[in-house]
Amino acid sequence: MYLFALWLVLSASVQVALAQNNSTESPYTRFGLGMRHETTSTATRALGGAALGLRRADVINSKNPASYAAVDSQTFIFDFGASMGVSILKEGNTRDARMLGNFEYATMLFPITRWMAISAGLKPYTSTGYRFGSTEALPGAKDREYTVQHKGMGNMSNLYLGMGFEPFKGFTLGANFSYIFGKQVYVRTIDYGTSGSYTPNFYEMLSARGFRTDVGLQYGFNAGRQGNITLGATYSPSLPLWSKQVFLDNVSQGTGIITTERNDTITSQEAFRMPHEIGLGVAYSYKDKLLLLGDLQYNLWRNTISDTSKATPVNQFRFALGACFVPNRESRSLGQRMEYRFGISGENHYMQIPDATGTLRGSLIGTLSAGIGIPMVDRRSWIDLTLEYKHLMPQAKGMISENYLQLTFGLRFNEAWFRKLKLD
């Protein structure tokens, strides 16, 4: 039954991955591997993504695989999420608002023994999505203009299988083994705006795949009579990605291709690499009512992309803080049993891009989040809602700033699959 459930979820997840795409509208995703997504569930997103020290029996925390061992020995947990939102891009006095919507993740967790558990699922790794253009004067022609259109789309997904175990009380170890795969397409078109004119088209496609490993540990101990502290740490080594890049430049007229200027395919096992990632976290819980979390992460993106002619990867630092409060888990009142979550996080973008003068500039990203967890009738399963506000601030004037408002909806089913029935 374990293998059948695993096969069912993974097969469905791969099919859904092919459709996930509209999660970002950012011109900055043109560079590198796109916008990097945090590997967090709906519940932990409301905590700012702080989860390295989180160890709960009813939450799938794939950010630290050591947490899997906390699952109850007689339950099966399935968690999936979807999001919708709006992005607002600003450049000078110009604003552009666009709607977003996307499948986010599907994960499951179940025990193998009392001290070991397995998790599997599909999560986004990066996404690319942008549409923008500019109109410029045609050199040598009075009152003539041409338009340059840019468009990009695609995503990379993380299909993982993980396990966690508890060799002795309070100390847990875990590992995720992931397959990263996806495709991204970039198109640039020059339109001269006259009937019968030639239209240059520049097409680029990146297809990449590879493996990723995450290892984690957690150690929990009592802090006072009713408090508990859990320390967490994770590490992911830098591994190569197999990549294929296709470059196609042509000139069209109407619906026909006049000439092809370039048609190249480049394959490599070293053009792109996964970054080294190091994370430390702490969680403090009190009387099953209050939960406080904090994370620090350092991701070594430098030297992970060989082609730095357009942009340069830099090492990334990220912090996250979160808090969760439950008034009374045993109350008959739904409002008293609900979880109220809050979080904040900040990071620098892992790519630096040139400004108008050609100087490489970075950007900072800050996120505020809030959410609720609504227990279902069985008091084991949950409806999770998270609202996030994200702001991307470039470190140079004149560059595009971005604001995102996103609502994520999650369903977390906790089923008693492995309990023995007693017949009278």
Where are these regions (language model features)?
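Subset of outer-membrane beta-barrel
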Residues: 20-424
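Bacterial Sec-dependent N-terminal signal peptides
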Residues: 1-24, 424
